[in-house]
A protein has these predicted regions:
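A short, conserved alpha-helix within the catalytic core of class I
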Residues: 156-168
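Class I SAM-dependent methyltransferase Rossmann-like catalytic core
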Residues: 13-51
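A short SAM/SAH-binding and catalytic strip from SAM-dependent methyltransferases
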Residues: 145-159
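N-terminal auxiliary segments of SAM/dcSAM-dependent transferases
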Residues: 1-14
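Class I SAM-dependent methyltransferase SAM/SAH-binding core
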Residues: 61, 67-121
Length: 268
């Protein structure tokens, strides 16, 4: 299979209110349905230790959250399993609608947008960047029970991605990602998104996303505690800190999970 190739996607450069961008974001909801993204995320969440423990309240951060509707679907599906969640929806654009926030509230989730570039977030000592909308004060260093990234990590080359993952490892108990799979079947599927009514922006970006996607253990290799994988080399102390899992999911997706093996309190 081809080497990983990251190219800027068209949607990233369109204004929030550009008609093509508005249409493309609607397309993404159909793409998620076609890929079964919500069910993939639900399975990943239900496989975590924190889900089995049903501990709460929980603090959750979604990176590259977009309009927040995918995560809302996850919250609705989880139902009473997680009745009390503090959620931050991080994106560099302010796309979350009041109706979406109301939907989270109906699930018992307190959701707020966090408008900041993720690399700014990753480069600061705290978990947020003031004066970004919805951000905590610059002196705060909150930890997250769970950080989620969905169709987001593939936007980054290895160096910035490693920086992002290092920030996630420092600030979370668990990190989940669902990304495009870099494989022949996924590439064929990306050329067919027009069949579900996708516009030109979405059709072009779908192909680019597969070329920038992942396979094998590529995300694990960039995780700062990658020695946590079974039989991996490295410092035994670091190996004891995390359990990693990386695998294909469905026809088109690639999943990664990193979870602290000792869940004693908040992450540092």
């Amino acid at each position: 299979m081809m080497a990983r190739w990251v190219t800027a996607e068209a949607l990233d450069h369109l204004a929030t209110d550009d008609p093509s961008a508005l249409r493309s974001r609607r397309d993404l909801r159909r793409v998620h349905r076609a890929m079964g993204t919500r069910q993939i995320l639900l399975r990943a969440i239900r496989a975590t230790q924190m889900y089995r423990q049903r501990a709460g309240p929980l603090r959750v951060l979604e990176l590259g959250a977009g309009d927040g509707t995918l995560m809302l679907g996850v919250a609705q599906a989880l139902g009473d399993a997680w009745p009390s969640v503090e959620l931050r929806l991080l994106d560099r654009q302010d796309l979350v609608q009041p109706s979406t926030l109301a939907g989270f509230a109906a699930c018992g989730w307190a959701a707020k947008p966090l408008v900041v570039d993720v690399l700014e977030w990753a480069g600061l000592p705290g978990a947020a960047s003031a004066p970004a909308m919805g951000a905590e004060p610059p002196t705060a260093t909150p930890a997250w029970d769970l950080i989620i990234a969905n169709l987001f990590l593939h936007h980054f080359d290895a160096a910035p991605l490693a920086r992002l993952l290092a920030a996630a490892a420092t600030r979370s108990r668990c990190f989940l990602a669902c990304e495009p799979r870099r494989a022949g079947a996924a590439l064929v599927g990306s050329h067919l998104v027009g069949l579900i009514g996708a516009n030109a922006v979405t059709r072009a970006d779908a192909v680019l996303s597969v070329h920038a996607g992942f396979r094998g253990q590529e995300i694990s290799a960039l995780w700062p505690a990658s020695a946590a994988t079974a039989g991996g080399p490295g410092d035994p102390g670091r190996a004891a800190a995390w359990t990693l899992a990386e695998h294909s999911a469905g026809l088109f997706s690639h999943c990664f999970r990193a979870e602290r093996r000792v869940a004693a309190g908040r992450a540092p």
